[in-house]
Amino acid sequence: MALVSINQLPENILLEVFMHVPARQLLRNCRPVCCLWRDLIDLVSLWKRKCLREGYVTEDWDQPVSDWKVFYFLCSLRRNLLRNPCAEEDMKSWKIDSNGGDQWKVESLPGAHGTGFPDSKVKKYFVTSYDMCLKSQIIDLKAEGYWEELLDKFRPDIVVKDWFAPRADCGCTYQIRVQLASADYLVLASFEPPPVTIHQWNDAKWTEVSHTFSDYPPGVRHIFFQHGGKDTQFWAGWYGPRVTNSSVVISHRVTRNPPHAMAQP
């Protein structure tokens, strides 16, 4: 019985096989095999089908996608890159930059003179004191699975969100700083709005802060996230701003027209 080359299979059968091969293996191991495999693996239809199969889009998806291959990888990597954002593990994963007053503390929602959080799944928050309290994380994008060409050529949006609230019976000041940095930690882009001061006898409402980094310079390899604050009345205890549910998420920008070629991840 004569052996049959896999390349003699109809292209639709080969595409079905490729549908079940992990995406990184497709680019690293399968795409270099021959011109036929390269051309099939570069087909938009393959990556769109993989997106459908993984649940990244639905059949009625109507938003424009300029590069389905990039879209697939960004969807597969999409998650909150900050660890322990809602204080479920006390202060784990956070670097304490300033620990003034009676220092950082974790409390359960809604807290004294506080209000419930909009998302009922969030149960805890970090709270500051009467002198400056700041905490931070540094995200290593390469360690999180984002390779250089994906970041430099396609420059996906980097969406930063944070939530803060005062106590109703005490004024406070809240601040946030987020920086995109190079491999050697040179700052390439930053978000650092003026501190927010809330007066005593407020509604203790939770407020969302949001910023999207787009079209930033190439070379981003790290993200520095820092937030915190203090109360304005210098009261002993934990009367400063409360923070929780912070997030840094990298997402595909569907309206962008990036270069077509993408190197192996």
Swiss-Prot record:
Cited CDD domains: F-box_FBXO6-like
Key word Cytoplasm present: yes
Highest taxon above the source species: Eukaryota
In-chain residues carrying the UniProt-annotated modification Phosphoserine: S251
Family annotation (Gene3D superfamilies): 1.20.1280.50, Galactose-binding domain-like
Domain FBA: from-to ranges: 71-252
Pfam families in alphabetical order: F-box-like (PF12937), FBA (PF04300)
Biological process annotations from GO: DNA repair; ERAD pathway; glycoprotein catabolic process; protein ubiquitination; response to unfolded protein; SCF-dependent proteasomal ubiquitin-dependent protein catabolic process
Cellular location(s): Cytoplasm
Xref: InterPro entries: F-box-assoc_dom (IPR007397), F-box-like_dom_sf (IPR036047), F-box_dom (IPR001810), F-box_only (IPR039752), Galactose-bd-like_sf (IPR008979)
Pathway this chain belongs to: Protein modification; protein ubiquitination
An example Gene Ontology CC term for this record: cytoplasm
Domain F-box: 3-50
Keywords, alphabetical: Cytoplasm, DNA damage, DNA repair, Phosphoprotein, Ubl conjugation pathway, Unfolded protein response
Principal location listed in the UniProt entry: cytoplasm
Subunit structure: Part of a SCF (SKP1-cullin-F-box) protein ligase complex. Interacts with VCP, CHEK1 and CUL1.
Its biological purpose: Substrate-recognition component of some SCF (SKP1-CUL1-F-box protein)-type E3 ubiquitin ligase complexes. Involved in endoplasmic reticulum-associated degradation pathway (ERAD) for misfolded lumenal proteins by recognizing and binding sugar chains on unfolded glycoproteins that are retrotranslocated into the cytosol and promoting their ubiquitination and subsequent degradation. Able to recognize and bind denatured glycoproteins, which are modified with not only high-mannose but also complex-type oligosaccharides. Also recognizes sulfated glycans.
Protein name: F-box only protein 6
Organism, scientific name: Bos taurus (Bovine)
Encoding gene (name): FBXO6
